[in-house]
Amino acid sequence: MQNRYLPYGKMNQCENNYGGNDNILNNNNYNNDDRYNNYKNNNIIENNNYTYNNGGGSKNDKKNIQRNNNSNYNNNNNNNNNNNNNNNNNNNNNNNKNNNNNNYNYNKNNYNKKTYTYRGRVRKYATALFFISTDFILMDDIQIQLKKPIHFYQKYLLIHGNSDNGIKIVLPYKYIGEIKLERFETSFNLSFSTTVTTGRQSARYVIKSLKNEFLIDFKNDLSSVFGNVSFFETDHSLQEMYKQIQFPSQSQPSSFSSSSSSSSIQLSPSPSSSSSPKL
């Protein structure tokens, strides 16, 4: 660049032919010119911001003015960034509040729904949950392959019919029968008792397979407890349910909890090449 210093006693103004000094540029003349863009990037004052009378100004004065302008510009940017950050923080806080509200509403809506605990933690969706339908029939000989290992205490475990993923595990919110699962090192004990709860089941979840698989060989144990029982839709009342259940040689459902009619079934891990479930 030439003529970097302002001449004394003369106004510095660039013209269309790029004549004169290059210190002060006219935005209208050089708006689409590469030289103007380069000068602008180099923090050279634009738009005829400064005029110099007799005596002019020194190079240091110009640099100071430019530096101050740039500082103000940067401060404005910083303030804008801070404002944006504050807005983002406010948005995050609002999102957190919304999430908390959603969690509160979810917990409120699911207040009467079953949750599962293991090692002191609440684990929702720990296993499959399905509506009981008329195809729920307990046969004499049942072999069931669980796609999910049992690592938690679990109530109201019943066996549903066939499915693409094998036998489904039903956890009804109401209905007779309670199976308590207690974990041991290599096996599980299932004990039956009668516990009837009120309310309705209103959620359905798909069973998810895990690495470990267990084979349960119920043989005749379920039929000895429940008989050849057919369960039905969840909108039936408990009285209607009791009327339709065929209890084997028992007049009262509460007798299921007695030691003579309770069933204990031991589970062991299945071999790696396990066969498909069959009914």
Curated annotation (Swiss-Prot):
Residues 68-109 have a biased composition (Low complexity). Residues 50-109, 249-279 are annotated as: Disordered. This is Putative uncharacterized protein DDB_G0285557. It comes from Dictyostelium discoideum.
